[in-house]
Amino acid sequence: MRVLGIETSCDETGIAVYDDELGLLSHTLYSQVKLHADYGGVVPELASRDHVRKIVPLIRQALKDANTEMADLDGIAYTKGPGLIGALLVGACVGRSLAFAWDKPAIGVHHMEGHLLAPMLEDDAPEFPFVALLVSGGHSMLVKVDGIGRYEVLGESVDDAAGEAFDKTAKLMGLDYPGGPRLAKLAAKGLPAGYKFPRPMTDRPGLDFSFSGLKTFTANTIAAEPDDEQTRANIARAFEEAVVDTLAIKCRRALKQTGYNRLVIAGGVSANTRLRETLAEMMNSLGGQVFYPRGEFCTDNGAMIAFSGLQRLKAGQYEDLAVKGQPRWPLDTLPPVA
């Protein structure tokens, strides 16, 4: 089976072609970072309009790169949600229209299921069951995964997601958009400076996250300290260590609770070097394994949507002709793949 994947949930237009026998045949991506940089964040209306401009040329390029004609496709997968409703509708309209015109089945894919399954695009793919840590700009959650569509959300953020906390803290430090990667780069220059940042919600039972208080603590620390480059780097390091330690503590709890010894990390924040190193050390000490996608598949992309959609289309799951976007969509409401 060969599937065209379309990702337009936020500020990246991702198109890919995936074949269940040959693997990933093509992958094209357009990022809107420069478009939104002057605003310090994503402007939904601008994002939607840019998707409209870029999506068709990218589809043509992906099909050309995959040496694939319309007749070679067996289905179309597009991101249905969660995400920005205007951006989602661009991908949904194009995906559904192509499916109708080409007489192909189509399915709307859950964006976070795409991230969760992204490590399966790698040669060293995880086997079920496992615990997944999904960390991005909009989501932070721990999920018990027993199969595709067999998900139990063990914990999630009650306020700011980890990626959102990175971006907002970067803005407090005067770093340009996108702030998360820039803060991590600054933190790499930091030294242990004796800052005692809290590890939120680790002093109580449970697997939920909360990062808004940590952001406020960082803001107060910035205001009380000298405004020089090394001090800012030291504060960035302390903040990053606090976020990573918090995520690691909750991952360890989730693994103990489930009895699983495989951990998947995915989403934009999974590209963070300190997070990867910390979780790798933790899993090594526990005698387990950690899996994550390559850097280009940590952020939003069409490959993960094509792969996820293919799994469901193969199982006979597809949707009617209605164009649907679902900005809020609980992960654990998805049907299982038999």
Curated annotation (Swiss-Prot):
* InterPro entries on file: ATPase_NBD (IPR043129), Gcp-like_dom (IPR000905), KAE1/TsaD (IPR017861), Peptidase_M22_CS (IPR017860), TsaD (IPR022450)
Tell me, in a sentence or two, what this protein's role is: Required for the formation of a threonylcarbamoyl group on adenosine at position 37 (t(6)A37) in tRNAs that read codons beginning with adenine. Is involved in the transfer of the threonylcarbamoyl moiety of threonylcarbamoyl-AMP (TC-AMP) to the N6 group of A37, together with TsaE and TsaB. TsaD likely plays a direct catalytic role in this reaction.
Q: CDD domains of this UniProt entry?
A: ASKHA_NBD_TsaD_bac
Q: What detail does the entry give on cofactor binding?
A: Binds 1 Fe(2+) ion per subunit.
Primary location recorded for the protein, binned into one broad class:
cytoplasm
Give the enzyme class: transferase
Keyword annotations for this protein, in alphabetical order, are:
Acyltransferase, Cytoplasm, Iron, Metal-binding, Transferase, tRNA processing
Q: According to its record, what are the GO cellular component terms?
A: cytoplasm
Q: Output one GO BP term.
A: tRNA threonylcarbamoyladenosine modification
Could you tell me the EC number(s) of this protein?
A: 2.3.1.234
Know the name of this protein?
tRNA N6-adenosine threonylcarbamoyltransferase
Xref: Gene3D superfamilies: 3.30.420.40
Q: Which reaction does it catalyse?
A: L-threonylcarbamoyladenylate + adenosine(37) in tRNA = N(6)-L-threonylcarbamoyladenosine(37) in tRNA + AMP + H(+)
Q: Where does substrate bind?
A: 134-138, 167, 180, 272
| One Pfam family cited in the UniProt record for this chain | TsaD
Q: Which residues bind Fe cation?
A: 111, 115, 300
Q: List the disulfide bonds.
A: none
Single GO molecular-function term? iron ion binding
Q: Where in the cell is it found?
A: Cytoplasm
SUPFAM superfamilies registered for this protein in UniProt: Actin-like ATPase domain
- Species per Swiss-Prot/TrEMBL record: Shewanella baltica (strain OS155 / ATCC BAA-1091)
Q: Which family does it belong to?
A: Belongs to the KAE1 / TsaD family.
